[in-house]
């Protein structure tokens, strides 16, 4: 992956933020700019966050894989596994109160699961890293929603679920 990419796309936003949003992998524009969720995908993400009164700069955003896959293909299982431990270390360093996984690659990297997002999205799960428990919710990625706009209604439900979790945990954003 590294040889195909121009930049490593690490993260962006508030490293002290209470929410960590993890996408799948950079695309062409993200690779060029060196920051996650750019262009139409970034615009949709910003709108999604603002719909529940969250400003993008208040949260921390990264990817499960930090290099762009060739021709924007879906990352392969061995590539996801290779970056999984790095991602988990990244989570421990940022130490958020809530984690949102956007897309199947992010879900597979954290949970080592090939479940369908349609079956797991919107449900709160947990992961324990270095003796710390993190609440996690999986939802569709903005790039998927741009390709399948009829799924936006499900993401809206997930966003409302996130908003409620923020209230329940008394997180100020």
Predicted features along the sequence, with ranges:
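A polyanion-binding, active-site-adjacent surface
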Residues: 1-173
